[in-house]
């Protein structure tokens, strides 16, 4: 019989607020450690989560899904989800958003089904094809005009291409790239109440700081913040060529 460690998620699962960020990141680090360092099966208990914001949910999806794909073991993680009768608020955040389905999509065919069913949470390693399905999904609800659609398409395209061109360009990721591709995880939807479109993308590569600065040593928060600001300034690029470094403007333009 397989013994599983149970990891209980914090009730307020959020990285936006400094009040909840520490507990949430600590929990996510535990998940990652058990799966990819210890290679131990776990059960993630989300049953008492009251609030799960989009960014934190996406981080959880990415870490769980990466382990499922790399280990070729969809069932290395099991879940306790909120019960609608006992925890309706948590059920709305975890189940109704499709997060619960995404967390159980531990194979490439299952991930493809998320795209076909136009789920909020998706994953891909192919910018050329996934951009179109994402835009189609958003536009079906948002009904953007031509200018808005162009701005959004350009921004999302550049974000996806950044992952493909920069996030995993290091020898440390050679085996990962061969196994699951230069993969990202995303969450996208149109909110009719706010009349706004949301697109969040996350990868598990080296990060902007190391990619842009090609920095290998230890760093501090202010140093990383300054480099990220520089990387998102028009004309700056890790390649150092003047004709490049415009992609960050495409990403910022729809905001």
Each language-model region and where it sits:
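Short beta-strand element(s) in the Bergerat
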Residues: 195-199
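Conserved ATP-binding N-box helix of the HATPase_c
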Residues: 63-66, 144-192, 248-254
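Glycine-rich G1-box
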Residues: 206
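Internal, well-ordered alpha/beta segment that forms a basic, Gly-enriched binding/recognition surface
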Residues: 95-135
């Amino acid at each position: 019989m397989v013994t599983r460690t149970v990891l209980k998620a914090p009730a307020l699962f959020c990285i936006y607020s400094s009040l909840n960020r520490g507990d949430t990141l600590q929990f996510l680090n535990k998940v990652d450690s058990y799966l990819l360092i210890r290679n131990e099966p776990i059960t993630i208990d989300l049953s008492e989560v009251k609030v799960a914001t989009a960014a934190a949910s996406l981080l959880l999806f990415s870490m769980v899904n990466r382990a499922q794909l790399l280990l070729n073991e969809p069932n290395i993680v099991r879940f306790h989800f909120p019960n609608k009768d006992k925890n309706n608020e948590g059920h709305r955040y975890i189940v109704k958003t499709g997060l619960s389905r995404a967390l159980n999509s531990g194979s490439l065919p299952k991930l493809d089904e998320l795209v076909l069913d136009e789920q909020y949470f998706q994953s891909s390693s192919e910018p050329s094809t996934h951009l179109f399905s994402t835009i189609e999904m958003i536009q079906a609800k948002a009904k953007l005009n031509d200018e808005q659609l162009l701005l959004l398409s350009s921004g999302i395209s550049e974000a996806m291409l950044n992952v493909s061109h920069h996030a995993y360009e290091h020898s440390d990721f050679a085996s990962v790239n061969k196994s699951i591709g230069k993969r990202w995880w995303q969450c996208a939807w149109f909110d009719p109440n706010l009349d706004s479109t949301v697109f969040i993308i996350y990868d598990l590569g080296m990060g902007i700081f190391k990619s842009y600065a090609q920095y290998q040593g230890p760093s501090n928060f202010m140093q990383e913040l300054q480099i990220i600001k520089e990387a998102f300034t028009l004309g700056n690029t890790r390649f150092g060529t003047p004709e490049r470094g415009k992609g960050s403007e495409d990403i910022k333009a729809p905001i």
